[in-house]
């Protein structure tokens, strides 16, 4: 696997601050090459239209960490998406401005360049369309993109980076969204023990190997592929938050067949992203496995994997322990900064 490096190809962009072209102005803003294993899925089409560049990623990261995106300048994207938690957090539900409680558990940000859906309900199909959601949501940043631009458009550091990325200093909503997406596209996690085993650089312990075999038999119908998600939307009978108007995927489709269905989460770095469930119903992974074993909530649209098996996934205590051993091999300490 190659380390992240720069493709030293110059991109010519011209200054257009006053609608004139400075033909002597050249910007070296090379695309960055990401350390993507050959066995990973294909990059999505949005990535290919907005490939991360040296300064695009730097600009996106600056936006990502800027508290001016919230109405009272108290939180940034990184307030909820913390690197130490695989860019999730340890809260049951996201905490927004004025300590408002969000609808759902904060999703991790990793390997987004390969996904087809974003948000737990799949409401966004392009990553570039996602950043506006937390900006305008009452329980999150409760601001507007117009207000954000007004706050930061005269910042000298932003002006410098905008010129390096786009050729002029003009700040627009589209440029904000594209830059944040470039930064998030660059967050590739592929350096776990599992990856080292996959590439012949390490071996599973006996317990990890046993856990992998149990996982293949009892978990991989949903958590499959190298991202350990099939990106489907399923109702798996988790406890329902009676204090919210949650409907899962049905909020997007308006169809009862999607009621309380959520996107199957990737299990990469799952060790770091507790609590679990759409609103943090489970404090740890063991409690998730116990719940699946004891039996989930039945409903008309309960996923057939449960519906056809007594509404549960039977697991012995030994199987649960081995599964926990295996899932820890999906942890990438370098990704979370350890």
Residue ranges and their predicted role:
Residues 1-24:
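Bacterial Sec-dependent N-terminal signal peptides
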Residues 17-338:
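Periplasmic c-type cytochrome electron-transfer domains
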């Amino acid at each position: 696997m190659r380390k992240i490096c720069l493709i030293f190809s110059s991109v010519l962009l011209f200054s257009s601050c006053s609608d004139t072209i400075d033909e002597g102005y050249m910007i070296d803003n090379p695309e960055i090459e990401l350390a993507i294993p050959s066995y990973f899925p294909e990059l999505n089409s949005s990535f290919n239209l907005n490939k991360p560049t040296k300064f695009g990623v730097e600009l996106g990261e600056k936006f990502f960490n800027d508290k001016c995106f919230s109405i009272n300048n108290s939180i940034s994207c990184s307030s909820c998406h913390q690197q130490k938690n695989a860019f999730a957090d340890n809260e049951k539900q996201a905490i927004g401005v004025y300590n408002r409680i969000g609808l759902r558990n904060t999703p991790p940000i990793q390997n987004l360049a390969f996904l087809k859906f974003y948000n737990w309900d799949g409401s966004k199909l392009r990553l570039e369309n996602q950043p506006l959601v937390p900006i305008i949501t009452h329980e999150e940043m409760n601001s507007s993109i117009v207000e954000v631009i007004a706050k930061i458009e005269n910042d000298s550091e932003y002006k410098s980076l905008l010129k390096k990325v786009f050729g002029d200093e003009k700040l627009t909503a589209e440029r904000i969204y594209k830059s944040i997406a470039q930064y998030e596209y660059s967050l590739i996690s592929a350096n776990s023990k599992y990856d080292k085993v996959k590439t012949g650089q390490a071996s599973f312990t006996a317990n990890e190997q046993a856990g992998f075999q149990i996982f293949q038999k009892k978990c991989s119908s949903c958590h499959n592929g190298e991202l350990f998600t099939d990106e489907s939307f399923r109702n798996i009978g988790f406890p329902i938050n009676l204090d919210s108007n949650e409907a899962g995927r049905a909020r997007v489709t308006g169809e009862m067949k999607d009621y309380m269905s959520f996107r199957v989460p990737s299990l990469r770095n799952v060790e770091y992203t507790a609590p679990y469930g759409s609103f943090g119903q489970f404090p740890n992974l063991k409690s998730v496995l116990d719940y699946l074993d004891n039996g989930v909530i039945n409903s008309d649209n309960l996923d057939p994997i449960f519906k056809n098996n007594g509404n549960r996934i039977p697991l012995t205590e030994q199987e649960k322990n081995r599964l926990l051993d295996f899932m820890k091999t999906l942890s990438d300490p370098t990704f979370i900064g350890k």
